Amino acid sequence: MGTLVLQAPNRHNIIMPSGLIPLFPLRVVVFPRTPLPLHIFEERYKEMVGGAIRDQSEFGIVLAHESGIGNAGCTVKVEKLLQMYPDGRMDILTRGQRRFDIVTVNDEKDYLQAEVSFFDDDDAAASPDLRAQAVLRYKELAALPVSQAFGEPDMFDRQLSFQLAQSLPDLDFLSSLLRARSEDARLKQLNHYLSEYIPRQRTIERMKSLAPTNGFGGKPAGL
């Protein structure tokens, strides 16, 4: 067992010291400061999470694909142990911490570990107009019947885009936001995405409401 080298990280903007962290591949994208509840049932992840709770340390969430894992992710810390089961399974609440690029993956333990390079945004302030537009579209999103929006956003968060995007279902899109080093760039991506996503969802909801009818808002003849 050894070390698998992944694609080299994109080294620009603010780069922070690297380190070795445990990895938890999942079909989910988590952002800094956003909550992520998890049910832990595999033995290897019981060990990993148990160590994180004991040491109050972080582990990395990376997007799992059929062909492997993404080359960027976000660490989380266990904020609360919600339930411990007799067989060692756990329900936990975690919260996103720091973003990272994967430099190398190490498989010497039962769970993956990786040498990572942490990064953050550049220091440029986000455009107030972009923020206002994104918040407006977020409120339109929250008004949809199928919305899973997370309540009122914290307008003082310098990375507001993460809050506004966390309930969206498109994991590839969320992964692209996670990797972006500019809040302006994320807000532009988010505004463009929502400008297409919201009308599409409205159309879907309207079609669902018409499905039991004859297409004109009334019941078919004979029913």
Language model region names:
Residues 1-11:
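Intrinsic disorder/low-complexity segments
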Residues 10-223:
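N-terminal low-complexity, acidic/polar interaction/targeting segments
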